[in-house]
Amino acid sequence: MAMEGPILCRAVMQAKLPVTMISNSLTKSGQLGTAFLGCVCKYRNITRLISPIYQPAQKNFATVCGSFSSSSDGNGYMAGNFSESDEDYVNSTVLEAVEVRSGAEGYVIKMRDGKNLRCVHNNSQGRNIPESAPQPAIVLRIEDGSETLLPIIVLEMPSVLLMAAIRNVHIARPTIYQVVKEMIDKMGYEVKLVRINKRIQEAYCAELFLTKVGDHTESITFDLRPSDAINIAVRCKVPIQVHRSLAYSDGIRSVEPARMAIAAGMSDGLLFTELDRPDGQPCVEAQEFGLIRNMLIAAVEERYKDAATWRDKLMLLRSKRKNWA
């Protein structure tokens, strides 16, 4: 059953603030642009596009075309419903990775502790790897026993905020992800799970699933960037699932088991490896990441003098590294 026709609604009075100013306040520092403006929201079977474009009204009434269709496809499936145990998806966890560099020999993942993990495609028919400089990334480990990793290139700010959430770093001012989490709670919904569902060319897509508190048959689905969806999932402590076809076609695996399995000592029958404990040497990469994190957090909290101080320390460290090289 479907109904279509014009709907009369009272025109909204022109706001004093232009939309560009509102958008800029949500996309501070240019890092979270179009994070939620313009996203597609699917409420059961009603699909609507939330447009950030504001049109000032010239009349008291305006005509809007709307549509409504049946909530069943004939098989009892309610549009917007989902199954957390869908066999097409597999659970994953977030690794504490900082950046990913790719080249002809594969991938190199830099971990938060400064260690480098060299990887290659999980299958011989994987995508061709274009050479690229180190880029901020979120790395997911597929929890199916295969030790497959899925690197997702993101902007630097979402990567830093994700590491802050994983390490429980306190940020004085609320981030956009904390605001969204509180908005969802106020609306009477809860985050159920996040899914990385497809890739369009080189860009991954994600879905955020919400359910009504007390009535899980009522759900809403949002299409988001993976960096935003994963940040929300970590803060809400919900599963992050990856489509199995993506894990198979784009997944990578470590090819340096020798470095990871070198015995560094035995204690009470436990084998400690080089990767499991520090070697006592200063790690310049970890120090550099700490300075970058402190600088970005200070900028988010609008402590610009502190951010400038961290920036100067970072430039000094990098200049020393260049001289050493």
Curated annotation (Swiss-Prot):
GO MF, one example: nuclease activity
Domain BFN: 119-254
Keyword Nucleus: yes
Primary residence: nucleus
A Pfam family reported for this protein in Swiss-Prot or TrEMBL: BFN_dom
GO biological process: protein ubiquitination
Alphabetized InterPro entries for the sequence: BFN_sf, Bi_nuclease_dom
Class of enzymatic activity (EC top level): hydrolase
A single Gene Ontology CC term: VCB complex
Ligase is among the record's keywords: no
Family assignment from sequence similarity: Belongs to the bifunctional nuclease family.
Function of the molecule: Bifunctional nuclease with both RNase and DNase activities. Involved in basal defense response. Participates in abscisic acid-derived callose deposition following infection by a necrotrophic pathogen.
Name of the protein in its database record: Bifunctional nuclease 2
